[in-house]
């Protein structure tokens, strides 16, 4: 039984190293993506939703659509606003349901992006610990045989894998926190504008 467990443990060594390298690669790629996204956000104005709601007062759906096209929203968000305004001829309940569905689609879009770094943040320490424990077995055996060279090599690999896993997890945790703050603000703006659109379409029916 112990031999089987030993074979399984040592057989996981190289897959564990490969996964750790992949996690580090994902972390590096995500650093590039978040820097690019931060540069885009810094280079564009943020929509003033309060002022926008005031400007939308008493406007027809087509006028609101044209107004939103001039605002610094993402193309995907502008398309959602346009689709919502296109439901002006539907009953109020249908418009509200459509708005909820579009908002859920936005939330799902952001959730998929953050899920990548969240996954790395969870797996990094796990595989780092796994990569630490696997070499310790042969290292302890080498210690019992007086083979300090093998022991030192095993310890070096163990510490390296721990560091790699923790670095990947730390980087992705920070990226996830930054993105969650951005996306929460984006979703709040989208929800506010959609509520304004629904209110103006309701007023237009009277």
Could you describe each region identified by the protein language model?
Residues 96-97, 102-103, 108-109, 165, ...:
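Short leucine-rich amphipathic alpha-helices used at interfaces
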Residues 77-84, 113, 193, 197:
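Amphipathic alpha-helices that form helix-helix packing interfaces
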Residues 1-74, 83, 104-186:
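Hydrophobic alpha-helical transmembrane segments of small proteolipidic membrane proteins, enriched
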């Amino acid at each position: 039984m112990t031999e089987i467990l030993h074979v399984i443990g040592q057989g996981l060594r190289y897959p564990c190293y490969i996964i750790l390298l992949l996690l580090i690669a994902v972390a590096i790629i995500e650093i590039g993506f978040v820097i690019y996204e931060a540069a885009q956000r810094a280079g564009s104005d943020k929509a003033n939703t309060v002022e926008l709601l005031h400007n939308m007062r008493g406007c027809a759906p087509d006028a609101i659509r044209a107004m939103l096209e001039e605002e610094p929203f993402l193309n995907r968000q502008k398309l959602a606003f346009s689709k919502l305004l296109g439901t002006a001829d539907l009953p109020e309940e249908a418009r509200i349901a459509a708005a909820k569905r579009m908002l859920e689609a936005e939330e799902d879009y952001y959730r998929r992006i953050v899920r990548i770094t969240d996954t790395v943040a969870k797996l990094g320490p796990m595989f780092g610990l796994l990569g630490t424990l696997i070499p310790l077995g042969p290292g302890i055996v080498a210690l019992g045989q007086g083979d300090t060279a093998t022991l030192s090599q095993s310890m070096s690999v163990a510490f390296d894998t721990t560091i790699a896993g923790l670095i990947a997890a730390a980087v992705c945790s920070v990226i996830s926190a930054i993105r969650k703050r951005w996306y929460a603000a984006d979703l709040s703006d989208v929800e506010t504008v959609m509520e304004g659109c629904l209110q103006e379409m309701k007023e237009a029916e009277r």
